[in-house]
């Protein structure tokens, strides 16, 4: 799950391996040289698991574990071959039993391994009978994984400096097979009975509550956990640790507990309260009780992603769950709430109802991302999360505007391709098209559809079309319910709304959004009362690629200078015309950025909107202002709007005070000078940075150095002061230096307002003494927010030796956890002094990085893009192409590689076309900035 990092932090600072898959090959060779009887990445459809009995015994001293898997299976046709998943497991013995009876043979089953497919074949002497129940018993052993997936080792240091070891699991998408032999595909659901053998000083937790503990030997306890509901293998979880916990009950009697290392359990209260509130919300919203007796949330010291939705035992990075009242930031509170909300939404979307295969991952992730906003808007209204939603859509559009993007629902087969699906298209675009559909249907109608979907498919698996079919019959026809929104609109037609009811064809409409990559650009041309609309596929660098000819069913919304009530129009064709009741001065489409499309206003349309922002910007909402800023710069990229007009539009920001338009402007403007940094254009680069400071100076000067205000006001303060200090704005730098001196003199004990800490630390890190002091404080800090603030600050150093040392240390993982490495590499990749070091480190350590973080993972994508996607010279482009093409099956075909190459090509083209125009624009007098 993507973490919520402030936008400015990031800026200041595919196919996969050639898995053997040729159906023409009669048989593959197993690792012992014998013929392997199955040549498909997917498991046979004729074998179904019913129930697993798992016994796991981990030794946290030798970092090994032993296991016994007993899995009940049924074959739909006679077969003597059982194909299962197994990866890095040493199978010592496999036997077969019919039903609950005796062994069929004293002779163990023959075991063949085919590591390239992560499969084993168990060969029975006699064919299994169709429709009969059998039990496969497998004994095996393995090392605890040194990566972040499978059954892996994690460590932490106590306040006294003692190193402690624990073992945790991360199975999604394809790593359950690293902990026990299994049928590791999401549609092969089964129930699980889990037993864990452990040392008496440790605690074991799993998906279900503990039933009993048995002393099986001196110094060895076996914990028996209750049988699970029917679920996919990737949702199984267990942890062996010395964690402490705090608990509360929901109104419906579900026990909610937060687990953490003993020194940090006092930071668990906020997440616990949020989890209880959110679980109660979801039970009510979905009208389906949470089906398990408990929900644990565990903070794992080493964790690659943000969090994981294992049923009944959700796992998190410490920074995604633990909240320190004294030191955690406003953005941390927002982030924790959203991530907990996301994982708890999965208990229904993903766990109760699961996609049939990973090509429809978005049914899990898009829904959970969308439900974050639906739930937290209600449960924590003070966070105002609805303001941040459209930012997710812009994130998705960044990658979805490239030719290398993919449809929301797209075929995948091997593990690396599956891992690549965990991207902004599955999460953010998935959420945005659901939000657009909700806006189209109305909140109540949409809710009826998804409740119907969840109830119909509970404990089952679904495809894309199953969701749309559930949305087809959602308007009540018997008059028993008050009709709202879409359903009431469907009863009468309107001359300005093409949403009148022939038949609600949600499926046809939504297939245009899930089965095609990209998104539409809508061009609006106003002529008197006539509004001409045209749609086309928005794609950067489209002149290099053939026309796609895609058409979408676009639910357009608009307001005008004459009416602020939202008007609606469903555009199904390439062009159409709507007629307004009267002529207008301006028209603004995509109200609130609820639609996943961008808009170009032809003729004098942009001039009218630019004038509106200049004269009376609060006439339209802050989200509408932010979307205008975004759309203007997106249009510059495809030469529909000049860079001068886009920059002119931003001049109104002198009077802006709201977080989202300012963040969106920074999102557009900061990358422009980052591209200049890579071309050694110091004079214009400096002028551009000065322009940005002048634009925001009044608002920067108004910021108090306190923690007062709403969450959005506090987040804005933190980012503006950081920007001012990093850009060397002296009033900010001098105050930050004073704070840092006092904080350092107190040996880090003095309390600094949380919202200004980032700016203070960034200034303090600019000399050797300050940098070293910050690093020493990092080692002893128990606060995730403070550690991330120090990490960021250390990465802003202009000393190449410090930056190189930081790369080496974070990769080793002794003091700075290796989980932080992708973020540190990216921050140094954004540093004007550090970016060559980051790019060099990525190349020299590629094989180790892939081993640790896995090919196709979002961490690998984050590092590839973070070190290269702001390059803007042909020399760097050739370097990038040369390096990745040399990798062959170890990364050359990754989607993130295609994305970064496209992005660099776009950067070069953009700079060649716009740099001189920017230089001249900066030289012109701007009365707005005086």
UniProtKB/Swiss-Prot annotation:
Chief location:
endoplasmic reticulum
This protein's record includes keyword Hydrolase: yes
* Name this protein carries in UniProt: Endoplasmic reticulum aminopeptidase 1
Any one annotated GO CC term = extracellular region
The record's subcellular location field reads:
Endoplasmic reticulum membrane
Highest classification ranks of the organism: Eukaryota, Metazoa, Chordata, Craniata, Vertebrata
Species name: Mus musculus
Alphabetical GO biological process terms: adaptive immune response; membrane protein ectodomain proteolysis; positive regulation of angiogenesis; proteolysis
Cytoplasmic domain ranges by topology: 1-2
Feature type site, description Transition state stabilizer: 427
Concerning its family, UniProt says: Belongs to the peptidase M1 family.
Membrane association type: Single-pass type II membrane protein
> Gene encoding this polypeptide?
Erap1
Task: Name the enzyme's class.
Answer: hydrolase
Instruction: Kindly identify the residues recorded as the active site.
Output: 343
Which intervals lie on the Lumenal side per UniProt? 24-930
The cofactor binding remark recorded in the entry reads: Binds 1 zinc ion per subunit.
